[in-house]
UniProtKB/Swiss-Prot annotation:
Monomer. This is N-acetylmuramate alpha-1-phosphate uridylyltransferase. UTP binds at G11, E12, R13, K23. Substrate binds at N105, D140, D205. It comes from the Bacteria. Pfam families: NTP_transferase. One of its GO terms (biological process) is response to antibiotic. Is completely inhibited by EDTA in vitro.
Amino acid sequence: MKAMILAAGKGERMRPLTLHTPKPLVPVAGQPLIEYHLRALAAAGVTEVVINHAWLGQQIEDHLGDGSRFGLSIRYSPEGEPLETGGGIFKALPLLGDAPFLLVNGDVWTDYDFARLQAPLQGLAHLVLVDNPGHHGRGDFRLVGEQVVDGDDAPGTLTFSGISVLHPALFEGCQAGAFKLAPLLRQAMAAGKVSGEHYRGHWVDVGTLERLAEAESLIGERA
């Protein structure tokens, strides 16, 4: 299974760290954030990774190269202007092929074992959901058995971790340009084609300096 890491965000909430460094290369406990994903993907048996980028993206290519030092083959999907999640994935589909692929947001840190996602995909998407963090109390979706449905205001919603397996058919009918992933997922949910799981391990959306410190604390505990 191929994997894609979303790495095109500007990281504006992490300034000044991201003024001259793309967020995926910001050090977390002494290691660029994106390298945690690359090492975990390689450990899970992934061999081919696609990374999209926009803001200071050449730095990402220069730092990671062809991926061989991680035991991976890395290809890049540069974006002149950020295409948001859906548009960025759609642009990279020719590099990802026709089979389901693993997707992970480049700005999260987690101890999730990506090998758990190697099982055959049933439907169009499989989402890893986590408990709602304090900064996202309403959550995103709801897990009913093994099916994911859209969230609501009632208790019991969960947050999309940014980790998933997607089938390229999810993007049928899409056009090139900037668009979000969430509407496509909700459309597939309405058709009963999105499965999911609730992960209760460590997961941090490293989107602010405070949450960067939280991730570093968790990594320190594991050392």
